[in-house]
């Protein structure tokens, strides 16, 4: 069992609870997100944890995968680029918004679930909301499930990470994986050449 965590404190609680591994959700991740730098988050966790550790957050290229490993993570956890694959069970407009988007098209808000999450601004606007005026109801309990409002947070308002600029078109999953692999190997060779 791997558990998503956004802080060192949550990581410790998860390990105390018996998880087998951790997914460090750092700044830039799609959907529910952390606000800590991946360098700081992985470093803090690696001071005491030597078990399986994935890094998530703004990972969309092979270079990003190499960087995740360089921080001390065992592997990278990638989400948003896979939404824009042919096999993904996402509506065409969601996929198109990712392909056409970049980091500037992402908003971080706790207004929908009480927990900070990254969403595509365009999907917030399509739901009839003003992204600049979103506010969390402090009296409302935190709820990460779909809402009973006129829109469903995860169905109509689309989670997405900041690394989407790397997503240029809708491709089969195998093609995305092959691209990530090629980019990783090229980045690894370049890095090894630099350090001699």
Across the structure, where does each feature detected by a protein language model lie?
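Conserved active-site-proximal phosphate/metal-binding subdomains
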Residues: 16, 38-54, 60-196
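Hydrophobic faces of well-ordered beta-strands that scaffold small-molecule active sites
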Residues: 1-3, 22-24, 53-56, 76-78
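Conserved short-loop catalytic and cofactor-binding motifs
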Residues: 2, 29-33, 56, 82, ...
């Amino acid at each position: 069992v791997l558990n998503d965590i956004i802080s060192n404190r949550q990581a410790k609680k998860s390990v105390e609870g018996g998880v087998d591994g951790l997914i460090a959700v750092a700044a830039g991740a799609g959907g529910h997100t952390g606000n800590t730098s991946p360098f700081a988050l992985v470093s803090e966790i690696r001071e005491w944890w030597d078990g399986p550790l994935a890094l998530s957050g703004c990972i969309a290229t092979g270079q990003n995968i190499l960087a995740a490993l360089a921080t001390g993570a065992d592997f990278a956890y990638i989400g948003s680029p896979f939404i824009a694959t042919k096999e993904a069970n996402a509506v065409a407009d969601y996929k198109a918004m990712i392909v056409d988007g970049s980091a500037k098209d992402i908003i971080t808000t706790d207004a929908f679930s009480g927990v900070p999450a990254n969403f595509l601004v365009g999907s917030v606007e399509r739901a009839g909301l003003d992204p600049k005026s979103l506010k969390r109801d402090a009296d409302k309990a935190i709820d990460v499930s779909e809402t009973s409002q006129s829109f469903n947070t995860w169905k109509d308002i689309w989670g997405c990470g900041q690394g989407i600029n790397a997503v240029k078109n809708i491709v089969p999953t195998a093609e995305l994986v092959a691209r990530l692999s090629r980019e990783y190997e090229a980045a690894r060779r370049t890095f090894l050449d630099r350090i001699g």
